[in-house]
């Protein structure tokens, strides 16, 4: 009897210790030992309570609602959660009702952050056009850059034998050029297809200078359109379907009809506010004069420079000095499109221009200030109809000599005699050129 009473008190003591928490790591094992008979315990065996306590965490690990809810509290901070809810909700493991509830809780916790960003991204993608929208106007004469710190050095009348070397120089200097090209001028553009494709592929800008350097101010609407579309079609075969949206009017000879047609065809019309006059100083000794014009133009705030890649002296001696001057001033030599803040996607179109209906087929009517004097010899097309003074070309004449002898600028000589060309390549012996209006 005493032994049983002793055993009863010992078992009761062990049960109390187990309920209060183990005082020694061996006590739970002792309570659970099978050698203590069940009938010695007047109340449920202490090991049953211990087993229940142990299995509770096991149950909670299988119920993902508990574990998911706890991270939700941490992840509901507005700073962190963005990428992770999308990943976790996408996992196929989250399929139970409890998990759906937890996910909904997490989603609602971050609604203020995600909903605003989602709506913002939705509205942006919906409004974004397939190509950037240009801010550069069509059919208006543009003479200067709009992006601070940029200069655009442009070249007319090519391509020609020196254009490839010009690209070498620009590439070596980390600069970009804009080429206003003709299909037929000093040479045929198809003979320089590889040069044109190289310029296009390396980020230089190719722009239109009409098909054959025509004086657009002497043409009717159909003639102007033809000069633009014929060059477009040739360029498209070279540049894999791309056609320029930028152009320069030969001789800067504008008329209201020219500008209206450029607006209708959606061309950006580029002039220049710096003239290097390299066509007048196409000798090694004349290079310093052209550099001086360039510096003076920059000092006056100019930013779009005019030069010609058809002159060897320009390419061999002038261009590097111009690029050095740009670097010295901390400026950047870029394309016209870039200096106007226009993305490269806008420099070209992939479909032919849309010709407006009702295009005029009549030639513009000349309105001279006074009737012209009859020429003493044959004249070339486009000569000024109000010319008062003529010079008949003789052997050895140059445009520079003719202009100097008659006290006029080369610009005026070329303007009054557009067929001669700004390089004086078509000064015909025995023909009369206008030297005064």
Curated annotation (Swiss-Prot):
Pfam families: LysM, Polysacc_deac_1. The keyword Glycoprotein applies. Coiled coil: none annotated. Residues 389-435 form the LysM domain. GO terms for molecular function: hydrolase activity, acting on carbon-nitrogen (but not peptide) bonds; metal ion binding. Residues 1-20 form the signal peptide. It comes from the Eukaryota. Its cofactor is Zn(2+); Co(2+). One of its GO terms (biological process) is carbohydrate metabolic process. PROSITE patterns: LYSM, NODB. Its EC number is 3.5.1.104. This is Probable peptidoglycan-N-acetylglucosamine deacetylase ARB_03699. It comes from Arthroderma benhamiae (strain ATCC MYA-4681 / CBS 112371).
